[in-house]
């Protein structure tokens, strides 16, 4: 069978789709990933076929959005409109690039960003659609915003957000549908996807949101987080450094723009020195040139979370779904310093599970970091983290279950 996977975003958005694509390809299927041009090399190096999905570098796009908006005090309506501008501007281009690629596919799989674009292309071709969700995006009563609210209010809030997003993108979506020969949409995409019977795979563990599986009643299968568990060039060097002394605390912020890396390294170094801890810092896309050097701190660009996390005392990160799952699977406490998107939701869930704490990244200081680390390194957090790890879905099982679901959905539509 032919599977086309459309995924927009940065590395953390693409890797789950690539992990599933590799398993489908291993089973003998024809798989093609449509990804931002800056991530084509990442996908091809993994062994998959890739085509451009959009013309912009998605990391540069993220950096520009943060540089323009993140630290400003603005009218919230103006801020919302500015945040939506990159979404609406890229809509037509993504549709035009994906439509010919998806022709003849047995199933079209979308990542979490631009699902509406992909849903319309699938409807145009008359092929089944499946979606990967990295946190609960459909109406439910279990997530926090970031405070925990009554379940009916949470459900109505999510429904209202869906409606508002639809209204703000209706112009570009109607134009896309007209170009594809489809009528104007009269309801938000989540409702249309449900009517079409689209498969919505929850690529996280149900235990992370107690009560959610019961609320949804099996309509949206949970498979656990999807990862390729790829090795990196730094893994052996990092393993030797870790083995030479006490286990470190890991610090990494994914693709998030975090301002001056030198300032962050200095703050982390000072906090860990006071606690008598070592720090392993992943710089990610940040420029590590000229950062200060400390005996108890090691800075690398990227490491394998699967290989390194189990050898650390705790993890401190931005709260991306994949990094959060890696920390939970490793069985060590977590501190989430969140920046945007679903990250405060994961911070709230880490707190609810009693395996860590969270706060806004911009509010973190040396003093708050010391206090938070002291809290999560306490024996009760360590014990609870190990207990949760024993209940997490194994990465291989997550990928297998997802591929099974996609094959079944494609076969049923034939």
Curated annotation (Swiss-Prot):
UniProt keyword Glycosyltransferase, yes or no: yes
Pfam families reported in the protein's UniProt record: EryCIII-like_C, Glyco_transf_28
Top enzyme class: transferase
EC number from the UniProt entry: 2.4.-.-
GO molecular function: hexosyltransferase activity; UDP-glycosyltransferase activity
GO biological process: one example: carbohydrate metabolic process
Keywords on record: Glycosyltransferase, Transferase
Superkingdom, taxonomy of origin: Bacteria
SUPFAM superfamilies in alphabetical order: UDP-Glycosyltransferase/glycogen phosphorylase (SSF53756)
InterPro entries to which the protein is assigned, alphabetical: EryCIII-like_C (IPR010610), Glycosyltransferase_28 (IPR050426), GlycoTrans_28_N (IPR004276), UDP_glucos_trans (IPR002213)
Keyword Calcium part of the UniProt annotation: no
Sequence similarity: Belongs to the glycosyltransferase 28 family.
Stated name of the protein: Uncharacterized glycosyltransferase MT1575
């Amino acid at each position: 069978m032919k599977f086309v996977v459309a995924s927009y975003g940065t590395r953390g958005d693409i890797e789950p789709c690539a992990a599933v694509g590799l398993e489908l390809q291993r089973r003998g299927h024809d798989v093609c990933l449509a990804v931002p041009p800056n991530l084509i090399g990442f996908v091809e190096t993994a062994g998959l076929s890739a085509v451009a999905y959009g013309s912009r570098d998605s990391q540069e796009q993220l950096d520009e959005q943060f540089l323009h908006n993140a630290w400003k005090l603005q009218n919230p309506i103006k801020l919302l409109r500015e945040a939506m501008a990159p979404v609406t501007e890229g809509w037509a281009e993504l549709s035009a690039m994906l439509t010919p690629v998806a022709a003849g596919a047995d199933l079209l799989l979308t990542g979490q960003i631009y699902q509406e674009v992909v849903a319309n292309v699938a409807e145009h071709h008359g092929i089944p659609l499946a979606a990967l969700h990295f946190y609960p995006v459909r109406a439910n009563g279990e997530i926090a915003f970031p405070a925990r609210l009554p379940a009916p209010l949470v459900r109505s809030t999510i429904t209202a957000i869906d409606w508002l997003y639809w209204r703000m993108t209706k112009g570009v979506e109607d134009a896309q549908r007209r170009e594809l020969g489809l009528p104007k949409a009269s309801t938000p995409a989540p409702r249309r996807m449900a009517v079409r019977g689209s498969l919505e795979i929850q690529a996280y563990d149900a235990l992370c949101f107690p009560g959610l599986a019961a609320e949804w009643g099996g309509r949206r299968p949970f498979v656990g987080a999807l990862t390729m568990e790829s090795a990196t060039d730094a893994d052996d060097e990092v393993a030797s450094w870790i083995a030479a002394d006490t286990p470190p605390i890991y610090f990494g912020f994914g693709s998030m723009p975090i301002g001056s890396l030198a300032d962050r390294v200095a703050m982390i170094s000072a906090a860990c020195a006071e606690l008598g801890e070592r720090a392993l810092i992943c710089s990610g896309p940040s420029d590590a040139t000229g950062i200060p050097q400390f005996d108890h701190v090691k800075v690398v660009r990227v490491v394998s979370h699967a290989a390194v996390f189990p050898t650390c005392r705790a993890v401190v990160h931005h709260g991306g779904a994949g990094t959060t799952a890696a920390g939970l699977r490793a069985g060590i406490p977590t501190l989430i310093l969140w920046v945007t998107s679903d990250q405060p939701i994961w911070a709230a869930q880490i707190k609810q599970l009693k395996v860590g704490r969270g706060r806004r990244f911009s509010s973190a200081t040396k003093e708050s970091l010391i206090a938070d680390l002291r809290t999560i390194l306490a024996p009760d957090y360590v014990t609870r983290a190990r207990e949760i790890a024993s209940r997490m879905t194994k990465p291989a099982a997550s990928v297998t279950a997802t591929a099974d679901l996609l094959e079944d959905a494609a076969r049923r539509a034939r």
